[in-house]
Amino acid sequence: MRVAIIDYGSGNLRSATKAFERAAREGGISAEIDLTADADRVRTADRIVLPGVGAYADCAAGLRAVDGMWEAVEDVAIAQSRPFLGICVGMQLMSERGLEKTVTHGFGWISGDVKEITPTDPALKIPQIGWNTIELRRQHPLFAGIPTGPEGLHAYFVHSYHLDAKKPDEILAVADYGGPVTAAVARDNLVGTQFHPEKSQALGLALITNFLRWRP
């Protein structure tokens, strides 16, 4: 099995690659973790990971700037229905639009727009940086075997925007940051996390392992 982590100049690429390598090694999973900027290698991968940090518009432009990459991601994730994981802004790009700086169109796989988080508590700063407990809205193989509650579902966030998903059945998990924040989304063979699995220690390692074993 080959897992393509897409390198388009955005995301915690080194730490993400090492986290996937560790998850495969410790989980006894035979997997080649391939950090690549080659669209052809993405097209032939068994599963793909799209990281991303920074502004939505910048990440969308960066991905489109890599020759054939936007189309390759759509081909693998939609036409071929292979497992896809979006991380942080990589998850946000699964949405219809991003409203940061300007209106930017995403892949349109998850209904809704990416909007600024607006906590009701003025003491809560933007961006949200640090640990937060997430709450599952439904069961999913991505979270199989992970204890519920603050001990198990403890994730690391760095963001000012979140995917305001329109369809409740596409919301997998939420966090409370002065109001509900979308923490994870899922549809068919597609999953995305607003938090960073590669920085989320036990939860992140378990989640990555589950993704590598997932057979949607």
Swiss-Prot record:
Highest taxon of source: Bacteria
GO CC, alphabetical: cytoplasm
Entry EC number(s): 4.3.2.10, 3.5.1.2
Keyword Amino-acid biosynthesis annotated: yes
Reactions catalysed: 5-[(5-phospho-1-deoxy-D-ribulos-1-ylimino)methylamino]-1-(5-phospho-beta-D-ribosyl)imidazole-4-carboxamide + L-glutamine = D-erythro-1-(imidazol-4-yl)glycerol 3-phosphate + 5-amino-1-(5-phospho-beta-D-ribosyl)imidazole-4-carboxamide + L-glutamate + H(+); L-glutamine + H2O = L-glutamate + NH4(+)
Biological pathway: Amino-acid biosynthesis; L-histidine biosynthesis; L-histidine from 5-phospho-alpha-D-ribose 1-diphosphate: step 5/9
GO biological process, one term: L-histidine biosynthetic process
Localization, UniProt: Cytoplasm
Transmembrane segments: none
Matching InterPro entries: Class_I_gatase-like, GATASE, Imidazole-glycPsynth_HisH
Keywords (A to Z) from UniProt: Amino-acid biosynthesis, Cytoplasm, Glutamine amidotransferase, Histidine biosynthesis, Hydrolase, Lyase
Catalytic center residues: 88 (nucleophile), 196, 198
Keyword Transferase: no
UniProt domain Glutamine amidotransferase type-1: residue ranges: 2-216
Xref: PANTHER family: IMIDAZOLE GLYCEROL PHOSPHATE SYNTHASE SUBUNIT HISH (PTHR42701:SF1)
Assembly and binders: Heterodimer of HisH and HisF.
NCBIfam families per record: IMP_synth_hisH
Function: IGPS catalyzes the conversion of PRFAR and glutamine to IGP, AICAR and glutamate. The HisH subunit catalyzes the hydrolysis of glutamine to glutamate and ammonia as part of the synthesis of IGP and AICAR. The resulting ammonia molecule is channeled to the active site of HisF.
HAMAP family: HisH
Entry protein name: Imidazole glycerol phosphate synthase subunit HisH
Organism field: Mesorhizobium japonicum (strain LMG 29417 / CECT 9101 / MAFF 303099)
